[in-house]
Structure formats: C-alpha cells, structure tokens
Amino acid sequence: MFTVKLLAFMVVAVSLQHLAEATPKVCAGCPVEVDPNREDIKKSLAHVMAAKNSPDELVRIIKASTQVVNGIKYKVVFEVKNPSTNQVKICKTAYVSRPWEYEGYNVLEFGCKA
C-alpha cells in the first residue's frame, strides 16, 4: 500500500513540476528597457544635456533603459537638432542618479554622431 501511495505522489509531483518552472525569471541588477516617453527619462536627459552645455534641441528619445546599481543607471539613445544649422544627430548617454548622495547626475558617457 505504501508503494502505491508513494508512486501516486511521485506521478503528481512530476506532473506539476512544469508549474514551478513557468514563473518568469527575474534578473536583479540587469538593465531593463523602459518607455522612452517616461517623464523621469525626459527630465533627467534635459538635466544631462544642460550640464554638458549642449546647444542642441531634443527631437525625440529613441531608446532608454534603467539598471539598479548603486543608484539608478540610465542609458538613453536620442535624436537632437542644432537650431543654427538644422543638423540632426543621434546621441548616446549613460548617467547615474544617486539622490541620497548628491543632486544631479553622474554622467558616464555622452556622445553624438551626425
């Protein structure tokens, strides 16, 4: 009798195993693609552009991601236009926000290509 119960338990356990594996994997600390139209992305990018004394005007944000590090790391790809020449460029930046340490952003990377 014990063998039958054990066998029945094992059959049920094996048949339900797929449910335990169906949960999505969470990757703590991995970059996550976010909506480029989020207000925090727009505001933080405006601060970074001002800190870099960029004469260009933001046209649109193409792609953005965030990552939890010792703060929030933002990576943003965006399009700008020079108001004097109307030249359009694609730019990339990466910066970290640590509001408990300082105001503003620690810019790790900032560059544009025509």
Curated annotation (Swiss-Prot):
Its main location: secreted. GO terms for cellular component: extracellular region. Expressed by the venom gland (anterior main gland) (at protein level). Pfam families: Cystatin (PF00031). One of its GO terms (molecular function) is cysteine-type endopeptidase inhibitor activity. Disulfide bonds: none annotated. It comes from the Eukaryota. Residues 29-83 form the Cystatin domain. Residues 1-22 form the signal peptide. Gene3D superfamilies: 3.10.450.10. It is found in: Secreted. Keywords: Secreted, Signal. CDD domains: CY (cd00042). Belongs to the cystatin family. This is Cystatin Pr15a. It comes from Platymeris rhadamanthus (Red spot assassin bug).
